[in-house]
Amino acid sequence: MPNRLLITNVSIARMDQPDDGYGLMTHAALLIQDGKIEWLGSVSDIPAGLGEPEELDACGRLLTPALIDCHTHIVHGGNRAREFEMRLEGASYEEIARAGGGIISTVTATRETDEAALLQDALKRADALIAEGVGLIEIKSGYGLDVETELKMLRVARAIERERPVRVVTSFLGAHAVPKGADADFYIDKVCIPALEAAHKEGLVDAVDGFCEGIAFDTVQMGRLFERARQLDIPVKLHAEQLSNIGGTKLAASYNALSIDHVEYADKTDIAAMAKAGSVAVLLPGAFYTLHETQKPFVEAFRSESVPIAVATDWNPGSSPMGSLLLAMNMSCTLFGLTPVEALAGTTRNAARALGLKDCGIVAPGKRADLAIWDVLEPAELSYRFGVNPLHRRIFGGRL
């Protein structure tokens, strides 16, 4: 017998059309078979002859796609609570980084932590996201900055998928920072690119990422890494225009990047390049909030150019120690001016697009049955309220 689940008496936010808001259906039902959505429609139109599927009465609750956190750094050693204090005492993110703190301090902790311990800590972070209805987590490397540790991080990311009911997509972020005392060009050519090649050989890389910024790598250096990614047929994405504008967005767009993330300093010409490339703008309000930034992303230009907007936690130990995608949705509205529809699209349909995935992020026949049922009356509540988890049930691969 096929594995079937029939959900009845439910409101469904399909999130399947950019011009149709939530795509809301009320008094609806949904049939899952073998891990995929088989049918959805009105309760009065439930197909006959279903036999005896497992049934779930949603009691009028809201069903959405399972949420997708499309930008995280949840595999790492240590924490940076002391740097939090330093920032409050007046030190800037760049000053901390140039003094050997920031990303480099996490690199040291991650190198010193064995694979088993990294996994146990990362599982706790994954559990927090899963508890809020997340069904897919993107996880980056980038706290190794050597071949051995970059591969260790990516192996841990892959292991999370085996240990928990969640999908994991990996990004190789070897170009995250310049190791202390190293030359950036030497590092890209002799460490980062060989690490990418080794990780790719092990099947550990779904995308290649980098940090293009004055305190990290310039466009020429990133271009060499992206060129190797292209040769290996690996899609790219980029942290760009977070603290300044040095041309990272246009570079990433020239490689048809899946997504370009942060983008607070992206201007109209950058956004036009993103639109032409089909790249998604991933907004990361947790970092904006934590770093006390003032330059907001040019949301109106993203809208006018029809650039898809995604929202993510950027969960990392330094600039965004935030383990709540629901809070990121709220912040994207209150800090950046997104609408609740845009925030939910940004953590479902557009988040899937930012990862190059077409089998999830919407509620439609043929898509994966990764779903969330919420104790809310209307979809806007998911962005409106914070500090409260309204998740009733999460469905992963068609299973409760």
Q: What is the predicted function of each stretch?
A:
Residues 129, 199, 225, 229, ...:
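Generic structural signal for hydrophobic
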Residues 1-49:
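N-terminal metal-binding scaffold of metallo-dependent hydrolase/deaminase domains
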Residues 10, 30, 35, 60, ...:
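Divalent metal-coordination and catalytic microenvironments
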Residues 235, 245-362, 374-376, 380, ...:
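Active-site-adjacent C-terminal substructures of enzyme catalytic domains
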Residues 6, 53-57, 394:
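Conserved beta-strand scaffold positions in the cores of enzyme catalytic domains, especially
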